């Protein structure tokens, strides 16, 4: 079950990718990612501090997860972590914060991944954003010669455009 899923998830990372030396807090929102999230990060070598990992069927997203970012911000400071990752209950959204507990905007996450993947020759085609993506993000991609296409708002539409254009990176701010 879970071990097989971790192996599948790890295939999305470059060979020999690791998080050794990083302290990461992950808030799993008492939801779907409560086992796989921490295990994936640990399997990549990170020192993991997991919160929101006690689902009881009623407490999903309750005062935790990506809809309650203050929890991850304070946990990052408490554990002196390098980064905080906060999932929503079904683990399809993420909010991140830096080592100071400052929230990292979704467009910033996409931009950082795009540049990193471009430099490592991992980016395929370009980026899919949405109609709500910041215009500054579009300008940033143009400046860095990365193709940028907007989709309607919603992960379904982002995924459709990614598949249609054979792109391997896309997302929206939420």
Describe the function of each predicted region.
Residues 69, 80, 85:
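Gly/His-enriched, cation/cofactor- and phosphate-binding structural elements
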Residues 79-81, 166-167:
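Short, high-confidence coil segments that cap the C-terminus of an alpha-helix
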Residues 51, 89-95, 138-142, 169-174:
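Short acidic (Asp/Glu) and glycine-rich catalytic loops that position anionic groups and cofactors
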Residues 1-77:
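Gly/Ser/Thr-enriched, mixed-charge loops and adjacent short helices
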Residues 1-7, 11, 99-171:
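Proline/glycine-rich low-complexity loops and linkers
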Residues 30, 89-93, 101, 133:
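Short, glycine/acidic-enriched loop or turn micro-motifs at the edges of active sites
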């Amino acid at each position: 079950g879970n071990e097989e899923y971790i192996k599948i998830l790890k295939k999305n990372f470059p060979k020999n990718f690791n998080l050794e030396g990083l302290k990461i807090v992950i808030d799993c929102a008492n939801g779907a990612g409560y086992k796989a999230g921490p295990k994936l990060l640990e399997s990549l070598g990170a020192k993991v501090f997991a919160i929101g990992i006690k689902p009881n069927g009623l407490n999903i997203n309750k005062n935790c997860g990506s809809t309650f970012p203050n929890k991850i911000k304070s946990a990052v400071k408490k554990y002196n972590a390098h980064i905080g990752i906060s999932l929503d209950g079904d683990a399809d959204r993420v909010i991140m914060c830096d080592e100071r507990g400052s929230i990292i905007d979704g467009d910033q996450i996409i931009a950082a991944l795009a540049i990193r993947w471009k430099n490592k020759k991992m980016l395929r085609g370009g980026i899919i954003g949405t109609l709500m993506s910041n215009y500054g993000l579009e300008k940033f991609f143009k400046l860095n010669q990365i193709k940028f296409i907007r989709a309607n708002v919603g992960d379904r539409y982002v995924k459709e455009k990614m598949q249609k254009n054979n792109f391997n990176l896309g997302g929206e701010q939420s």
